[in-house]
């Protein structure tokens, strides 16, 4: 058994397709698409494979989805603090030729061990069809207990099972300290109109903070320049389309300037790219929110494209996300963001900073 890499993605997809093709009851198994399996190969997520020579005989995936919608804890009405202490045993797949050798249980144990090495004491959730007696028996033998029965994955009946090391542990909602700074930035959710329009929505939130009463799609429709390749000074694709990519700080700054100039507004937009996160806090102290680039649900960004402009190479990252930094708590080391996907959320400063740095410390301020 070994941890799989991106080089193993094709064999993972081939084995999954083989399982799907040979299932006598298709309701028992729901395939994972290629982009998701690719994400599962990126740390902190992991896929472990059992090999017979070069042949993939079985694999299991463990993922840390934080507070993303796919976290099964939402189905159990868990709060955000508990979600961040929860991993998902997403899939265990065993080639029919290798069944009967205990591979499902071995992979389950490996995934549990890995999850708790990264996040000691974490809860691990998984789903199994009520009619898949073999899988139910195996996961329950590894300490999983049924939490709920419901419909998932587009109409498939499932149990949610949990391996919960401390059922009595409480996860109180975060309460900021008396030293916390919090600005009243009204949140706007980008969906369903702008599935990839987080940047224009973040800009809209800040402009509305200054008294401009913009509708959700106005910036995206009237002021955002678009291009099929350029994500640095233009929006690559269409923010109304799920396949759109995004626009980086230089382009978003120019978008803001176009709007402010047309309105004869007193504010000016400035690109602060390169500024350490801690050096943005003085703006918050002055009641000035800052647009920053991080990732969706604090997921690991994955370099997927590049674009050269003015001799400089820029990299675009899958999971890139643009939000409004509108508060911080120096005692609890949290930052408050107005997130077009999650709403107003306190994020852990350390992880937020790691991703902010990885994306090039992109930030835009209007003042």
What spans do the regions from the language model cover?
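A short beta-loop-alpha structural element at the N-terminal edge
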Residues: 1-14, 25
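Conserved acetyl-CoA-binding loop-helix of GNAT-fold acetyltransferases
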Residues: 94, 100-113, 137, 141
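Conserved active-site alpha-helix within GNAT-family acetyltransferase domains
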Residues: 120, 130-149
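Conserved GNAT acetyl-CoA-binding A-motif
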Residues: 115-128
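Noncatalytic regulatory segments and standalone regulatory/sensor domains
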Residues: 298-300, 304-319, 323-367
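Conserved acyl-donor/pantetheine-binding loop and adjacent beta-alpha core of acyl/acetyltransferases
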Residues: 59-91
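Active-site rim helix/loop that mediates acceptor-substrate recognition in acyltransferases
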Residues: 25-53, 61
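Active-site-adjacent structural segments surrounding the nucleophilic cysteine of cysteine proteases
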Residues: 170-258, 262, 296, 303-307, ...
């Amino acid at each position: 058994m070994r941890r799989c890499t991106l080089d193993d993605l094709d064999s993972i997809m081939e084995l999954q397709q083989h399982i799907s093709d040979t299932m006598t009851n298709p309701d028992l198994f729901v395939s994972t698409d290629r982009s998701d399996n690719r994400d599962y190969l990126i740390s902190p997520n992991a896929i472990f494979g059992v090999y017979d020579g070069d042949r993939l005989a079985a694999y299991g995936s463990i993922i840390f989805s934080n507070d993303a919608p796919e976290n099964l804890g939402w189905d159990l009405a868990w709060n955000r603090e508990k979600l961040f202490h929860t991993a998902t045993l997403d899939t265990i797949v065993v080639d029919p030729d290798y069944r009967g050798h205990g591979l499902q249980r071995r992979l389950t144990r490996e995934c549990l061990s890995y999850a708790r090495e990264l996040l000691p004491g974490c809860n691990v959730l998984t789903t199994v069809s009520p009619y898949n007696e073999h899988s139910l028996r195996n996961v329950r033998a590894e300490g999983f207990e049924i939490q709920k029965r419901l419909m998932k994955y587009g109409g498939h009946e499932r149990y949610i099972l949990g391996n919960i090391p401390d059922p009595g542990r409480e996860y109180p909602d975060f309460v900021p300290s008396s030293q916390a700074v919090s600005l009243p930035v009204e949140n706007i959710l980008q969906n369903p109109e702008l599935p990839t329009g987080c940047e224009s929505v973040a800009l809209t939130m800040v402009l509305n903070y200054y008294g401009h009463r913009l509708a959700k799609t106005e910036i995206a429709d009237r002021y955002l320049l678009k291009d099929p390749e350029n994500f640095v000074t233009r929006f690559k694709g269409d923010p109304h389309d799920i396949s759109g990519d995004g626009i980086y700080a230089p382009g978003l700054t120019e978008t803001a300037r176009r709007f402010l100039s047309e309105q004869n507004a007193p504010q000016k937009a400035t690109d602060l790219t390169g500024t350490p996160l801690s050096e943005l806090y003085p703006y918050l102290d002055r009641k000035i929110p800052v647009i920053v680039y991080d990732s969706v649900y604090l997921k690991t960004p994955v370099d997927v494209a590049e674009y050269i402009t003015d001799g400089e190479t820029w990299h675009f990252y899958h999971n890139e996300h643009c939000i409004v930094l509108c508060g911080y708590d120096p005692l609890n080391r949290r930052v408050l963001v107005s997130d077009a996907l999650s709403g107003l959320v306190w994020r852990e400063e350390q992880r937020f900073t790691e991703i902010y740095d990885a994306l090039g410390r992109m930030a835009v301020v209007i003042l």
